[in-house]
Amino acid sequence: MDLHSFSRRSFLSVGALTLFGRFRLGEALALRAAAPGSSPKPENLSIILLWLAGGLSQFESWDPKPAAKEGYRSKFGSIPTNVTGIQVGELLPLSARHADKYTIIRSMTSQDAVHESAQAFMLSGHAPRSTLQFPSYGSVIAKELSPRNELPPYILTGGPVRKWEQAAFLGPKYNPFLADDPNKENYKVRDLDLPLGVDWARVDRRNSLLRLADRQFRRMDTVGIVDAMDTHHQTALTLIRSERAKRAFKIESEPEKLREKYGRTSLGQGCLLARRLVEEGVRFVSVRSGGWDHHFNLFNDISTKKLPELDRAFAALLEDLNERGMLGTTMVIVGTEFGRTPEINVNDGRDHWPAAFSLVVAGGGVDGGRTLGATDQNCWEVVERPIHVPDFIATIYAKLGIDYHQMYQSNVGRPVRVIDEPFEAVQELLT
């Protein structure tokens, strides 16, 4: 059969096959838009990112300021951890028991106070520019390090995928695989099973037709949409055939007691799924949690919902990884795009404050039981060991053995550094 013998119906059937009827125009257009201690050996290291979108308040979490002046001081106090001299916010009692496993960076600093661009900066190491979208470090990791098996090297939970989490000019091959929300009832990842009434013989026939169509349309494709669709299609086929993938995503096989320990929340079950994925060889898993932009009603929301969810999930993840002997080869990062203002506003909230904020890094050969850097008494500014965003991203690449001085070619042929300069990897996290 050649292309000219296709009927309209045959062609539509091929189109439907690409994602078994689930690849819609919006997804196609999105792909089109995306197209323009003793450290472990880099090849053995995996990363789990707990991404707190909106801007976590450092006052109520990792950098409490009980001596801050009135109007700045949190309504919640600080508590000791299992490491002498280190305190965290009182809403993190479970995490406080594991301080020996993590480093608190209290001196992150940036100038970007806008959510979208600040997230893009924190997830790429590039200050955003209007003319160019930069790849996330998850996508760079997927490109630079070979997949360990048939599972995607970069997986994201809590979708939908934002543009700053994508591969940009590296191409759709390195976009994250979206695992949706594992806390949903009857959770199931799409594309892991054949649709009802479709067998492998039918799939193979349609796959042959699709390859034939691809050859023709690739000649007319100037923006990479065919490559994008083909990448998504081939990923789907690979996962459907993979028993490893089915096993990895089967979160319901976990003991009920363990699921409850992580917390029956999107963040908690996302962390549990991340552990399962890393256990099966996935290199980078991003667990996204939204709702951290507390301009209003900070103290009620962060005490009744957000920080208890984080505390439970993070502590359970560290304990689980440690008990399974995986913490040494799994780096866990608790990240956010910026901090919150020292001054409490009239709405009982805090506004955006990139000048001084906190991150946490655990495992992956990073020594625990310490803090890095410091802010002043009211957390207006960093007063000790400032760490800039590109410094932190360079550190991640260094841990993975990725050359962070290399140059890429953008989609318009322009040379682009993998990270904005100047930067310096954080040596305290490498030794």
Which positions does each model-derived feature cover?
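Ligand-binding pockets and gating/stacking loops
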Residues: 1-431
